[in-house]
Amino acid sequence: MAKQATVDTTSNFSRRALLARAAAAGLGSFAMAPSSPALAATVRTDFSKLPPYGNGTIPEGIRSRQVANVNGMTVHILEAGYETPGRPAVLLLHGFPELAYSWRKVMPSLAAAGYHVIAPDQRGYGRTLGWDDSYDAGADPFRILNMTRDAIALVYALGHRSVAMVVGHDAGAPVASWSALIRPDIFRSLTIMSSPFEGAPSLPFDTANGAPLLRPAVTDDELDAELAKLNPPRKYYQNYQRTRGANDDMLHAPQGLHAFFRAYYFYKSADFKGNKPHPLKGRTAEEMAQIPTYYVMEKDKGMAATVAPFMPPADYIANCKWLTEAEVEVYATEYGRTGFTGALQGYRVRRGSDPRSIAEMHTFSGRTIDVPAQYIAGKSDWGVYQTPGAVDKMRNSACTHMVGFHLLEGAGHWVQQEQPEMVNSLLIQFLRDYAKP
């Protein structure tokens, strides 16, 4: 049975006002680094002025609240299993364009299995505060190592020294994976969903003794240049996501934000029968052009126009059990309030797009994920194969203790929402077999 999530109510400051206060206090660019504890404690919002969270669709036993002093932010979380102190923790990290809400169908079962289940709105998303919502503010705080600090700080703020399992879906997968790679003492096991983890980038090795230099990977810009030569011309979606105009394109979609989310989620789900993913031979324009247009877009279209033709019919919408109209409205309401800029910032500093991020990651060259790990995705999810070779790297080198690789029937990209019972079963069995509190 669903109920309205409870929320905490505190003082009312906007993100931009907080930045101004930080600058006035001589603290420099608040968005560029974690703030002082004193400042972080003031990063609040008046939740009573926001629409009730979850549109009445939050399952029984899940609560919504704010957690202050988390790497310079006040983080909004959903949590379950909080009633009993001392439970081992499970941390769930969502993707794009998602929210903590995306884990609503997974959390009750994990709590019933004996865990304190924590799902935050990640930096840039939803009701989490403490980041600048301006494109011009820059994306440095969204680099992967700072997002990893976010995860550690949240775990500590909630009174845990470790978590039994960290789970990351889509854009949350690299955060979860890097967390397990860097701090295996905290993140004791790992579940990767949808986006395979290729491992830390490699530094040249043994070159002083004549070993060849590493062959550079095809960059997104190089791929885009080749995609533009196709007929019709195409472009890689992550380059689009990095543009200034991506926020307005989606936020002000001509079809309306609710219809945008409905079409976007349908197009990437198993319900769209055109999703028939398979391994690609390489990261060439010809191979990548086989991927649907939500990943390899038509060059002259934004995402709103890309998904508009894939709006499902009314009878499908009325009978869609995994994503009801009330649930779609939760996403439309939250993103309608915040926009997409914060959620898109991570794409600007992804590996391969930002030299400074790559330089930071090179610190961990040669390091592997050694905690127990598993991979879960939908069988109809092109996210598995959109980066050719990534699955093999994850299974053969990035993770030394990969104990499960699961592609689920009847699921596309939104695996934990499309097939929650199967996902729950895999997560709980994995915890029983491999996780250490």
Predicted segment positions?
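N-terminal twin-arginine translocation
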Residues: 11-17, 27-45
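Conserved beta-strand scaffold positions in the cores of enzyme catalytic domains, especially
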Residues: 64, 117-119, 405-407
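Conserved HGGG/HGGXW glycine-rich cap/lid loop of the alpha/beta-hydrolase fold
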Residues: 78-131, 169-171
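N-terminal secretory signal peptides
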Residues: 1-13
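Catalytic active-site module of serine/aspartate enzymes centered on a nucleophile-bearing elbow/loop
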Residues: 402-437
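Glycine-centered tight beta-turn/hairpin loop motif at sheet-sheet or coil-to-beta transitions
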Residues: 70-72
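Hydrophobic residues on the short alpha-helix immediately C-terminal to a glycine-rich phosphate/catalytic loop
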Residues: 22, 106, 179, 183, ...
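Flexible "cap/lid" subdomain of the alpha/beta-hydrolase fold that forms the substrate-access gate
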Residues: 43-65, 75, 83, 89, ...
